Amino acid sequence: DNNGAISVTTLDGCKALKISTELETGEYNMFIYYYDGYLRELLVSSSSVYSADSGQMIIPASDFNVAIKKNNLIKFTITDTNNDINTFYVSYKS
């Protein structure tokens, strides 16, 4: 995490994990979020115009939640289409 590069935000009203990075060609943002029945991923230039329906579908789902916890942990909770709740944590390096 480069000084706030990982955050929780909203994208068209959808809760999303946002990961920002600076490349030679500019600043880019990656969003992981739930929209219209799917967990989605969207990678865009920070100067682009985009919407939640622009993201690539990853897996079918019925709900998604993300939270940044202490000790550099991100908590993901995904409810699948069978209404089974799956929770996992991802650690990141500061």
PLM-predicted stretches and their roles:
Residues 1-10:
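Membrane-proximal N-terminal amphipathic helix
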Residues 9-10, 21, 25, 77-81, ...:
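Residue-identity detector for threonine
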Residues 13, 17-73:
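Type IV pilin-like appendage domain
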Residues 68-94:
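Low-complexity, S/T/G/P-rich flexible repeat/linker segments used as non-globular hinges
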